[in-house]
Amino acid sequence: MIELSNITKVFQQNGRSITALADVSLHVPTGQIYGVIGASGAGKSTLIRCVNLLERPTEGKVLVDGQELTQLSDSQLTRARRQIGMIFQHFNLLSSRTVFGNISLPLELDNTPKADITKRVNELLELVGLADKHDVYPANLSGGQKQRVAIARALASNPKVLLCDEATSALDPATTRSILELLKDINRRLGLTILLITHEMDVVKRICDQVAVISDGRLIEKDTVSEVFSHPKTPLAQKFIQSTLHLDIPDDYLTRLSPDYHPDTTPLLRMEFTGKSVDAPLLSEVARRFNVNNNIISAQMDYAGGVKFGIMLAEMHGNNADIKDAIQFLQESHVTIEVLGYV
C-alpha cells in the first residue's frame, strides 16, 4: 500500500544543508498497522509528511496504492491525497464549527451532496463513539474526544491510508489507550492501512504489526513487532524495549549495591525473557543443575505482537563458579542478563 524507495530529504537553513532523511526505504503492506519509532529530531515527522508530499523528497520515490505521487500533477496529487487521511498531535479543529461541522468540512470542500454528508458524518460519529456530540463545539470536548473528531474528519473521504503523526503524545495514559484501541478497531473494521510515528514503544507494543526504528534520519532496524521485541538488533531498539518494562531496584538494595564482587556478596541480576524462554521453567532448572538459589525481587510480563516477554530482578545465591555456569546456561537459553552489581 505504501512504498518509500530511497527517500532523502535535505533542508536548506542559513546557507547550510541539513539532511533530515537519508536513503530511507519502507514498505507498509495493505491493511497493516506500521509504527516508526525514534527520538525527537530523528526524522519521524519528516518521513510521514513525505508520504502525502506535505514534504516533497529531495530524492526517491513515494508510491501509495500503486501511484507514484512525486510524478503527479497538482490536480492529480489533490485527488490522490483524498485517499490519505492524516491526524496530528494537535487536533486542529475549527472552534467556530460543531463536531458535525468539523467532520463534514472535507466533504463540503469536495462538493458532496448534503444528504450524503449527513449520512457519512453520522456513520463516522457512530464509529468513533461520539454519536451524542453532534452539535457540541470543540471547547466543550476533552482531549480524547477532540482526537476522535480529528480521526472521524480524516476518514470522511473513505481513505485507504491513515497517517498518524504523534497522535497520542498530548493525551494522558488512559485516553491514549482508548485512542489506540479505536485505531485498532478502525483498522480491523475497515481494513485501513495505518502508518504511525511515535517516540513511545508502548504505542508500538499495543497496536502495531510491524515497526521500524529511525535514528539520525536513517532506518536502522525494521521487522515484525514480535521479532524486534524478541531479538532486537540495535542498542536503540533495546533501549526502547526496556522503556516498556522497567523495574526499579528497591531502596534497601540500592544502599547495599556494590559494583565489585566480594566472597560474601551475591549478584543482583536483571533478566529479560522473550519468546520460548518466557514459558520455560529456567530458574528451576538452573537451581537443580548448578546448585544455585534464586531470590526473585520483582517481575513483570507483557505482550507485543502476540508474543510474551518479561523482565525480572533477582539475586542468585551459590558459589561463584556455579553462578557463572548458571548465568551462561540462561544466556544460551535466550535470556538476556545484566549483572547490576553485588549485594
From Swiss-Prot:
SUPFAM superfamilies: ACT-like (SSF55021), P-loop containing nucleoside triphosphate hydrolases (SSF52540)
Annotated EC: 7.4.2.11
Gene Ontology CC: Gram-negative-bacterium-type cell wall; plasma membrane
Residue span, ABC transporter domain: 2-241
An annotated Gene Ontology molecular function: ATP binding
Keywords: Amino-acid transport, ATP-binding, Cell inner membrane, Cell membrane, Membrane, Nucleotide-binding, Translocase, Transport
UniProt: ATP binding residues: 38-45
Presence of keyword Repeat: no
Catalytic activity: L-methionine(out) + ATP + H2O = L-methionine(in) + ADP + phosphate + H(+); D-methionine(out) + ATP + H2O = D-methionine(in) + ADP + phosphate + H(+)
Keyword Transmembrane helix: no
Subcellular location field: Cell inner membrane
Superkingdom of this protein's organism: Bacteria
Membrane topology note: Peripheral membrane protein
Family of this protein: Belongs to the ABC transporter superfamily. Methionine importer (TC 3.A.1.24) family.
Quaternary structure, from the entry: The complex is composed of two ATP-binding proteins (MetN), two transmembrane proteins (MetI) and a solute-binding protein (MetQ).
Described purpose of this protein according to its UniProt entry: Part of the ABC transporter complex MetNIQ involved in methionine import. Responsible for energy coupling to the transport system.
Name of protein: Methionine import ATP-binding protein MetN 3
